[in-house]
Regions:
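Generic beta-strand/beta-sheet core signal
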Residues: 82-85, 102-104, 112-114, 147-148, ...
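Short His/Asp/Glu-rich catalytic/ion-coordination signatures at enzyme active sites or charged loops
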Residues: 1-12, 214-217, 261-288
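Long, highly charged low-complexity segments
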Residues: 2-99, 113-118, 122-136
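Conserved small/polar residues in nucleotide/adenosyl-binding loops
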Residues: 303-305
Length: 305
């Protein structure tokens, strides 16, 4: 009998779930309980069945002339998105394969630098990219928007472009705005906030045993994928920025804590952290003593009941 289903206090549950931000549970607290054996099969029924299509104009940059045009665009725009493509996720050793930019929604470009495959066309040399695009990015760094810039900043720095400040990071904007609404990768954010299904990394590189390195992806395929990344990042920024405008506390948290930490954590990841072994050992002993004391107190409390 103790396993029988009991009626809950739905009103109190709803208030508690709202206070603790248990959003999926909050909705279920006000719904009558049913014994639908198939309810788990329909858990995504409230998600949009059709995704939005967007107009886009993406281009591959292969000449200094076109690079200068985009450098001017960065000078003239109010905000721009930047993203890097690499041959590895290790920021210490990864090589830069290309850079993508977007200065307005629907517009984007890709600058291929390090693709390697048979029949690969001539690409931009790194020095000219740093001299033309890099100098413009550095000059306009206060306009720069990215998605997880903690990855891009050290990659760019190792290849000669110092993005030592930036305007916004959409991953952090999403997390601060609502940490539990969705995962904070770009693909998930695009679906959640823009109702748009992006081209996935696996769509261009393949999966499992057939997966290839991004440097082996043909430039025309890589170009659309990368330029879309920058375009969607800019669209996400515009959306999230409008939502955060109504939440001054979260916006202050972003500016005062989250964004400065990006550079701190990036430096720690690149350079490591110096640790005082003696202090660490002493602290370990102190924590062990506290754990033992709390454990003893917990057992005493249990014996009382």
């Amino acid at each position: 009998e103790s396993l029988l289903e009991l009626n809950g206090d739905e009103e109190r549950l709803a208030k508690l779930f709202a206070e603790l931000e248990f959003k999926p549970m909050k909705g279920s607290a006000n719904k009558p309980q049913t014994k639908d054996k198939n309810k788990n099969l329909n858990q995504n029924a409230d998600k949009p069945t059709e995704t939005k299509k967007i107009d886009s104009n993406y281009e591959t940059i292969l000449t200094q002339k076109d690079m200068k045009i985009w450098a001017k665009k960065l000078d003239d725009c109010k905000v721009f998105a930047i993203d890097t493509e690499t041959d590895s996720l290790d920021t210490v050793t990864a090589n830069l394969v290309g850079i993508s930019l977007s200065d307005k929604e629907g517009e984007g470009c890709y600058l291929p630098i390090g693709h390697q495959y048979e029949g690969c066309p001539k690409q931009l040399d790194l020095k000219s990219v740093v001299d033309i695009i890099g100098s413009s990015v550095e000059k306009n760094r206060h306009k720069a928007v990215g998605q997880n810039l903690k990855f891009d900043i050290p990659i760019l720095l190792r290849h000669g472009i110092a993005l030592d400040s930036f305007h916004a990071d959409t991953m952090l904007m999403s997390y601060v705005l609502n940490s539990t609404a969705t995962r904070h990768g770009m693909d998930k954010l695009a679906m959640y906030y823009l109702n748009y299904e992006t081209v996935k990394y696996s769509d261009v590189t393949g999966t499992a045993s057939k997966q290839i390195n991004f440097s082996s992806v043909e430039i025309d395929v890589a170009s659309h994928y990368a330029a879309e990344d920058a375009d969607i990042t800019l669209r996400l920024f515009n959306k999230l920025d409008s939502l955060l405008a109504e939440k001054p506390i979260q916006k202050k948290l972003l500016q005062d804590i989250e964004y400065p930490l990006v550079h701190v954590l990036s430096r720690v990841e690149q350079n490591g952290a110096k640790i005082d072994k003696n202090k660490l050992s002493d602290h370990s002993i102190e924590l062990s003593e506290k754990i033992e004391k709390l454990s003893s107190e917990a057992f005493k409390i249990c014996l009382l009941y």
